[in-house]
Regions:
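Short, acidic, Ser/Thr-enriched surface-loop or helix-capping motifs
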Residues: 99, 149, 216
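ATP-binding/phosphotransfer module of carbohydrate and carboxylate kinases, centering on a glycine-rich
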Residues: 1-62, 66-135, 197-198, 251-370
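Glycine-rich phosphate-binding loop and adjoining helix at the ATP-binding site
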Residues: 104-201, 322-333
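Short, active-site-adjacent cap segments at secondary-structure transitions
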Residues: 146-149, 187-190, 212-213, 222, ...
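Glycine/GP-enriched mid-protein hinge/lid loop-to-helix segment characteristic of carbohydrate kinases
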Residues: 107-109, 163-164, 170-281
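Short glycine-aspartate micro-motif
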Residues: 83-87, 136-140, 202-206, 212-214
Length: 370
């Protein structure tokens, strides 16, 4: 007797999330929602009325759909809910308040310093006071890994000693009386990239002092993406190669991370290298070398989980086309799944506040996810 109500409640919530997930991407009429979700028009209309009543969606001006007919699109209300966001980076931290449309309403940035956690909490409290707190869904936290995301704990990311062992989710949740969700920065970036709507089957690759990757398949983070994020840099590309800090030899990170690439060269940064690539044979050689090593690690993943797009993030976003041309050539020649034209390579979002927006998307993903 207790099973039926639980199943009915689950089905109702599932259908509601299905409608909301569609509306998050774009405005749609009730008829379009019914076709997109597979729900009946009656069920879709009932859900729409509930969402309108709850103030989560709104009606837009009617639009002509031909033959003298019109339809009234529905859209998510930007001010229906909010998310607080914390983006932890190695040299800085940013805190923000975002609405349901992904607009960054408030923003604070702090350099790495003593007492940083107290500054973060104070900034979050001030932002929370500026809106109806009952509409704040939670706090999204983006951080380099390795992390214990389920436990909300930052483990031991390199060059991140200040945060080692900090149970950040519990601390912020207790301080703000809100749920807090910790996520790998690369996975958070992938969630944000998904919401930009260009692809639902992609790999996002982050290259700086380390290498991380997250994979989206059909709009879902692949189950082991959180594993890939921390470990792709430690896949072996040369069994007798360089010693890695992890204890193994020949890890991708020892060849394709930016510090490894620049070691022994005349360049101090990827930007300097890229700016010299048109005139400097050394720079040209290093760009090709980066593509060669990076592709060796990525092809292993692509052969298991094909995607149509690769997004480059981190330092290599700058003048990305230099690297993309060589990467595409290597992948085309060595991957199992297709030709040069079968995969697109782009830079990830270049919004200067992308880290903060991505942390907010961790919260919104929890709300919208079916």
């Amino acid at each position: 007797m207790t099973q039926k109500p639980r199943n009915a409640d689950y089905t109702k919530e599932y259908n509601r999330k299905a409608v909301l997930s569609m509306l998050r991407r774009s405005s749609m009429s009730r008829a379009e929602l019914a076709r997109a979700t597979g729900l009946s028009r009656a069920a879709t209309s009932l859900i729409a009325e509930e969402l309108l009543k709850d103030g989560i969606v709104m009606e837009l001006p009617p639009q002509s759909v031909g033959r003298g007919r019109s339809a009234t699109p529905l859209a998510v209300r930007a001010d229906s809910y909010y998310a607080l966001a914390v983006d932890l980076a190695r040299k800085s931290c940013s805190v923000g308040l975002c609405d349901m449309s992904g607009h960054l309403l408030q923003f604070r940035a702090f350099p790495d310093q003593d007492g940083l956690l107290d500054l973060i909490i104070e900034a979050l409290r001030r932002m929370a006071q500026s809106v109806d707190k009952s509409k704040i869904l939670g706090i999204g936290i983006s951080s380099p890994g390795p992390l214990d995301c389920e436990g909300g704990k930052i483990l031991n990311p390199p060059q991140f000693d200040r945060w080692h062992g900090v149970e950040i989710s519990a601390i912020l949740s207790q301080a703000l009386d809100l749920p807090a969700y910790l996520e790998h920065d690369v996975c958070a970036l992938a969630l944000h990239q998904l919401e930009m709507g260009h692809s639902r089957n992609f790999m996002l690759v982050f290259v700086d002092i380390g290498i991380g990757a997250a994979i989206m398949s059909g709009g879902e983070l692949v189950g082991n993406s959180r594993y890939f994020t921390g470990e792709v840099g430690h896949t072996t590309i040369r069994f007798d190669g360089r010693q890695c800090a992890c204890g193994n030899r020949g890890c991708l990170e020892t060849y394709a991370s930016i510090p490894a690439l620049l070691e022994g060269s005349s360049f101090s940064s990827w930007r300097e290298l890229a700016d010299s690539a048109e005139q400097s044979p050394e720079a040209q050689r290093l760009v090709y070398q980066e593509a060669l090593y990076l592709s060796a690690g990525l092809i292993n993943l692509l052969n298991l989980i094909p995607v149509d797009t690769i997004y480059l993030a981190g330092d290599v976003c700058y003048r990305y086309e230099l690297l993309a041309a060589h990467l595409r050539q290597e992948i085309s020649a060595k991957a199992l799944f297709g030709s040069t034209d079968s995969i697109r390579i782009y830079p990830s979002s270049q919004d200067p506040n992308v880290g903060t927006l991505s942390a907010a998307d961790v919260v919104f993903d929890k709300f919208f996810r079916i």
